[in-house]
Amino acid sequence: MDQARSAFSNLFGGAPLSYTRFSLARQVDGDNSHVEMKLAVDEEENVDNNVRSNHASLTKPKRFNGSFCYAVIAVIIFFLIGFMIGYLGYCKRVEPKSECGRSGDSKEIEGTEPPETEEYFPETPSRLLWTDLRTMLSERLTATEFTNTIKRLNGNSYVPREAGSQKDESLAFFIENQFREFKLNKVWRDEHFVKIQVKGSNAQSSVTVVNGSGDMISLVENPTGYVAYSKATTVTGKLVHANFGTKEDYEALSYPVNGSLVIVRAGEITFAQKVANAESLNAVGVLIYMDQAKFPIVNANLPVFGHAHLGTGDPYTPGFPSFNHTQFPPSQSSGLPNIPVQTISRAAAEALFANMKGDCPSSWKTDSSCRLEFPGDKNVKLTVNNELKEIRIFNVFGVIKGFEEPDRYVVIGAQRDAWGPGAAKSSVGTALLLELARIFSDMVSKGGFKPSRSIVFASWGAGDFGAIGATEWLEGYLSSLHLKAFTYINLDKAVLGAKNFKVSASPLLYSLIEKTMQEVKHPVTGLSLYRDSNWINKVEKLSFDNAAFPFLAYSGIPALSFCFCEDTEYPYLGTTMDTYEVLSQNVPELSRLTRAAAEVAGQLLIKLSYDVELNLNYDMYNDKILSFVKDMNQFRADIKEMGLNLQWLYSARGDFFRATSRLTTDYKNAERANRVVMREINDRIMKVEYHFLSPYVSPRESPFRHIFWGSGSHTLSALLEHLKLRQKNSGAFNETLLRNQLALATWTIQGAANALSGDIWDIDNEF
């Protein structure tokens, strides 16, 4: 090393004994370069000793060669050291998580032990596959657990549990404690003070037959059941039968109903719709009964319960939440009836038929005892003595927070209360809710399941009175919910039979539902739930008495409800016979069917909360809009006679189609790993439903603003009905109203197209 140091010193002029000079100067008289190398102490010594010292001149090259080699070696060593330092520093800066300079093919020397140093292995985030998650869910679903939970919920501790009762509150606290035991990320409850209608405490309601002078001939019944939100009054009139009380039934009648009491069969449509239809034709009151043909119940004296509010939520705080001490002026929903309505037993209905004449049409397929109308010398007197009562209700919540987007969530819920035992109506749904909360919490804590988005479990209060708990929650937090909640799954009445699997849902969820039906097998047949490729055309609209309805029609949140059921309606809903024993007798495979319902809901939850892309198929609304345009084309002649045309509707429809196509292109080109880009696309998708809420009507006056699934003159169905009225009864047709309906419907579709396009500079429409 000393020799190398000496050589290095000599190279840079440290030693005066010798040096090397390279002359690269070009010759003046030629193009060739000349290189001259000299070794000397100095130039003078070199000249003086040039001839004299031959020996010295022979030995000097040896000194030079050794020094030069050492110098070159030193330079190379320093160069290599510098190169290695620079290379290692570069690796650490550019690839901090990789093993720099390590060859994957290197092997340890035999007979030597590796150094006792801790090696760094980078953590690669593992993402569970769909098959893994599906198996994880299936392994945790136990049929007996569902049966045990249903039994427990229908024990004496929680039955009966009418909304606001002590047993209803006890069950709410039990569910809250269960959520805490399941170790959900957060558990809470909110309370509302609402008005419901109950049976009168001072006087009974009654149905009597009277003569022309109003004197009582006979007491038919003092009903045990009742219809909440009926007008409390007394009316008298001729009794006429109107089958189920649908609009089509009234159109087929050969006698008027104005000024008369109407008796109708339960089923087909809700109690509230039956009353609204009768009131629109100036009937003075409505009686509702369950005929044996549709509801084959042995007990002819079985009482029935329901409600007559054509809407959801507390009807005395329409459009705003029923929190305590809210300072709103007294008001009431426009969906409350102005006529009395009462349920009666089948025995009471048959007693009334005994005084009536005219056989019911065979097309009604009802009991042989059915009759059409009272004779002219007799009437029926109806007295309803229901009372308003303010109660406190609870909604109970638990959440599993998402790991990447906790502020986006899917909500799954079930009604908790019931007028009777409520086994099929609320216990099955509540059991599903509890078991799914337990299972998903276990999947997260022990199975490695990491949902990207949050899952909210909700137990609703006062569901029997028109989804009051769910609606009040939506009204209270509407400003944030439509930005964050992207799907609601309803578990109410999920198991009512075994033959069929039926779904009611937003079109955005059709594709996801179809995939789920293909994955889940029917527990009885062993075949896939997906049996009919035309199932979408058989999907029924969500009804007013379904808790999923306000999510879709009021809040613009995609919602779905499903059930295992028979071809006929389950006869014991809303009666005192809705017990666990009756349910298990009518549905022998109750435990297995409940497990299958949980598997359906569970798979939906996984796909909605876990997948990078949001499983909402916005293309389905292209079909809905196209179908509406085709229906409108049938009235082109009428529209032309009014000096109107459908060009702007065609343009709006085209813009919506282009917007969906552009979004599909953006989605296909997006980098799945880029969560920011995917979130922006998903946010555009999740707001599609919301943009079909008409911005031109008041949420208070017309709370169900959805133009496809809502209720009111702003809906597309109301527009079509109005055009039909021009052909049937031109005197009742209002051209100004129709012009407004067409313009606002067109602009709502156009607004949805613009919103779906993204930023305003990306909007490219022909409107």
From Swiss-Prot:
Glycosylated where? Answer: 211, 258, 324, 734
* Endocytosis signal, short sequence motif: residues: 19-22
Q: Which UniProt keywords apply?
A: Cell membrane, Disulfide bond, Endocytosis, Glycoprotein, Lipoprotein, Membrane, Palmitate, Phosphoprotein, Receptor, Signal-anchor, Transmembrane, Transmembrane helix
Phosphothreonine is found on: 20
Q: Name one GO molecular function term.
A: transferrin receptor activity
Top-level taxon: Eukaryota
Q: Which InterPro entries is this protein grouped with? A: PA_dom_sf, PA_domain, Peptidase_M28, Peptidase_M28B, TFR-like_dimer_dom, TFR-like_dimer_dom_sf, TfR1/2_PA
> Which Gene Ontology biological process is one annotated for this entry?
intracellular iron ion homeostasis
Give the lipid-moiety residues, type S-palmitoyl cysteine: 69
- Quote the biased-composition stretches of kind Acidic residues, using this chain's numbering: 111-121
Question: What stretch of residues is annotated with the motif Stop-transfer sequence?
Answer: 60-63
- One GO cellular component from the entry? external side of plasma membrane
Q: Which residues lie on this side of the membrane: Cytoplasmic?
A: 1-67
The UniProt annotation puts the region (Disordered) at 96-122
Identify its protein family. Answer: Belongs to the peptidase M28 family. M28B subfamily.
> So what does this one do?
Cellular uptake of iron occurs via receptor-mediated endocytosis of ligand-occupied transferrin receptor into specialized endosomes. Endosomal acidification leads to iron release. The apotransferrin-receptor complex is then recycled to the cell surface with a return to neutral pH and the concomitant loss of affinity of apotransferrin for its receptor. Transferrin receptor is necessary for development of erythrocytes and the nervous system. Positively regulates T and B cell proliferation through iron uptake.
Q: What name does UniProt use for this protein?
A: Transferrin receptor protein 1
Q: Tell me which species this is from.
A: Equus caballus
